[in-house]
Amino acid sequence: MESNQEYQVLLYYQYVTIDDPEAFAEEHLRYCKEIGLKGRILVANEGINGTVSGTIEQTTAYMDHMHNDERFHDMTFKIDPHEGHTFKKMHVRPRPELVTLRLEDDVNPLETTGEYLEPKDFYQALQDENTVVLDARNDYEYDLGHFRGAIRPDIKTFRDLPDWVQENKDMLEGKKVVTYCTGGIRCEKFSGWLVKEGFEDVAQLHGGIVTYGQDPEVQGDLWDGQLYVFDERISVPVNRKEHVIVGKDYFDGEPCERYVNCANPECNKQILASEENEHKYLRGCTHECRVTPRNLYVKEHELTGTQVEERLLAIGESLTQEV
């Protein structure tokens, strides 16, 4: 009967001291399983960061439970309706940091962070020629969708961002620097780091891209593409005024918003690919990934050696060619 119920996804975080993250995580996991939630929650000394899915009844109970705890009484939940769960399991894990920057001198967002810009003010900043808008997410997130004119840092993980800034300081110096991320948690710490590094005019999109897309006034305007999310949805829309596809198919460069993982489990690279190209290239991002005996696409579709060779010949490759 669950399939007839309405579900929703909660995205949230709170920087607040949690004295014993391990004990908190253990108890919190028990509670989440008890009420039927699924999702991923990280707990650290510095706070909590989570995405969970459940029925409206389950998620409402969870929000009430959290708001009844003095530490989280004012925590903001970003709510997205969905047809079902967006996770297969429930995980609550203790971590040294909520977002991994691994700074020698850590930043406490409760003490140092950039100015908060509400969606309307951020919308204005996007059109200001003296403002640099910096995407604080990873390159594959940017490639699926981003704010028009935003800078794309060439990074694979968040912890690489400070080094990228140091190498590209000339791009940012003397400008107002405005940064954004999915729900706001990365920017809380990153914008604080920018302030500590001596950037004088630093701001962040309050509540992140999710809040911007839900704002009734801006309606996601000036966002192009889709928003990458870290659950089974993979992507969600943001701009409610127009839809511009910015993603490009890994294989032919055509407009594409469909992410798949390379079929070589040792590679597992995320690539944008149409269904047609996924089949054509055996979901392998390189020849080596296409011909590996561990190729998951070949196993899933139970392809014979002859069938694999036929696919390869169609793209000018062969099982016998040197890798």
From Swiss-Prot:
SMART domains: RHOD (SM00450). The gene is trhO. Signal peptide: none annotated. One of its GO terms (biological process) is tRNA modification. This is tRNA uridine(34) hydroxylase. Belongs to the TrhO family. It comes from Oceanobacillus iheyensis (strain DSM 14371 / CIP 107618 / JCM 11309 / KCTC 3954 / HTE831). It comes from the Bacteria. PANTHER family: RHODANESE-LIKE DOMAIN-CONTAINING PROTEIN 7-RELATED, THIOSULFATE SULFURTRANSFERASE/RHODANESE-LIKE DOMAIN-CONTAINING PROTEIN 2. Residues 127-221 form the Rhodanese domain.
